[in-house]
Amino acid sequence: MKFTLPLVIFAAVASATPVAQPNAEAEAQWCRIHGQSCWKVKRVADAFANAIQGMGGLPPRDESGHQPAQVAKRQVDELAGIIALTQEDVNAYYDSLSLQEKFAPSTEEEKKTEKVAKREAEAEAQWCRIHGQSCWKKREAEAQWCRIHGQSCWKRDALPEAEPQWCRIHGQSCWKKRDAAPEAAPEAEANPQWCRIHGQSCWKAKRAAEAVMTAIQSAEAESALLLRDTTFSPVDRVGKRDPQVCNMRLHPKKVCWKRDASPEAACNAPDGSCTKATRDLHAMYNVARAILTAHSDEN
């Protein structure tokens, strides 16, 4: 298959217009503090990128017509798209993975499907740029909120009936119907387990998912330790306290804390950076876990 950032995701990112938020810098700074959600997301993104880069080149044998290998490639592409959405430059991160250099090229059948999907996405994108169209209104209202993987409107659009990307998940009814691979090559028929061999696509998909799961679990454990560390004060890392408000001789301690905690409150609001990053982590975890479940009997 051809590795390109899913077109539906690309259109959403391209059409989204950033909306200025009060105290946005303080909120973002809080979210990046060691142990906070944005720090965890960055750690997972780095771990995934390192895992992909360490996989070597193309598989040592032809995978064309082999269904498990094709599914494994789609799984990695799906996980890469989700993680890329959490980055400031979505396309730069996705392109830096160079997935096309790690997995076998598309079969002719996949290329045909990709061309049709691209034409449909481009046609929709052109139509939705016209001021006043229903999709234009929807994008204008939801651009900032709905482009984040895991938001409520993203979940609505990700239903099997509404979102073709859902069909990439192994086992879905639409996956079985649309993505059923052509008849396997004789070599694959004779040895259906070869996709699990070191360097093949199934092995690579499992290793990428393991890297994500390990990074999430490690980050969560480290964050939990920080919460129990009485010497760690994230408030001090956001900015200096206001001496007029936080003079301990004139004001109770909790007044200073409430003032300093405002970036934390904003970050953990329903539309805050910490909340969004937490949803992103859940999305990454769920997809990685699905990949590991699909390859649970592999070495």
UniProtKB/Swiss-Prot annotation:
Entry's Gene Ontology BP terms: response to pheromone
Provide the protein's localization: Secreted
What GO molecular-function term can you cite, just one? mating pheromone activity
What do we know about what induces or represses this protein's expression?
By light and circadian rhythms.
Q: Does the keyword Nucleotidyltransferase apply?
A: no
Query: Which keywords does this chain's UniProt record carry?
Result: Cleavage on pair of basic residues, Pheromone, Repeat, Secreted, Signal
Give the signal peptide, or none. 1-16
GO cellular component annotations, sorted alphabetically? extracellular region
Recorded superkingdom: Eukaryota
Which residues are part of the propeptide segment? 17-28, 44-117, 120-125, 140-143, 157-164, 179-192, 208-299
- Signal as a keyword? yes
Q: What does this protein do?
A: Pheromone that is regulated by the circadian clock. Expression is mating type specific and under the control of the mating type locus. Involved in conidiation.
What protein name is recorded for this chain?
Clock-controlled pheromone ccg-4
